[in-house]
Amino acid sequence: MARIHQDHLIDSVADALQFISYYHPKDFVDAVHAAYEREESKPAKDAMAQILINSRLCAEGHRPICQDTGIVTVFFKVGMDVQWEGVTMSPTDMINEGVRRAYLHPDNKLRASILACLLYTSPSPRDRG
């Protein structure tokens, strides 16, 4: 039986969002590098080199790849045998708390693009104060 603690879920969501904010997927970096190696046009090579340099700087400095960090979409699947521990929040509230913490991380604050949810009446998990 899997046991999931509330704080672990919140931290996992926050950590995952921070991670994807500053790391390009390896297949993307490999594809840009391969295209750079094949490219004959100097301006195109320069543009791809800058993309690769920027990608590395983001990864090393833990800074977002793009200023607009987008909209968070979480797909959350829980098995029947999961046992929750230390839970005082609903799964949705735990995920929203993880998103909030990721966006307000003191070392890498992310820019919130959405002020309120477009589909429902619930507010964005981002603090406004």
Question: Which stretches of residues belong to each language-model region?
Answer:
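Alpha/propeptide regions of enzymes that mature by internal proteolysis
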Residues: 3-62, 67, 71-73, 80-116
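Single conserved hydrophobic/aromatic residue that forms the stacking wall/gate
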Residues: 120-129
